Amino acid sequence: MTVIRLTRMGRNKKPFYRIVVTDSRKRRDSGWIESIGYFNPVVEPKVLKIDEERYNYWLSVGAKPSEKVKKLASK
């Protein structure tokens, strides 16, 4: 099954997340199909960028967003 989830980037105590489309059986940070955005919770204000067109495309073909991605995308 295809999922949309966060993958952690950055360094110790300075996380930065990519919003990626991947297979649900893969590990969190392993290979992904497509990167559709990013989320940076460290800076003020928090930065979120999602390619809405690609996000909606992946939802239309059956990808399931994680709870956190769902929450972020609704903002």
Curated annotation (Swiss-Prot):
Pfam families: Ribosomal_S16 (PF00886). One of its GO terms (biological process) is translation. GO terms for molecular function: structural constituent of ribosome. GO terms for cellular component: cytoplasm; small ribosomal subunit. Coiled coil: none annotated. Keywords: Ribonucleoprotein, Ribosomal protein. NCBIfam families: S16. PANTHER family: 30S RIBOSOMAL PROTEIN S16, SMALL RIBOSOMAL SUBUNIT PROTEIN BS16M. Belongs to the bacterial ribosomal protein bS16 family. HAMAP family: Ribosomal_bS16. This is Small ribosomal subunit protein bS16. It comes from Aliarcobacter butzleri (strain RM4018) (Arcobacter butzleri). The gene is rpsP.
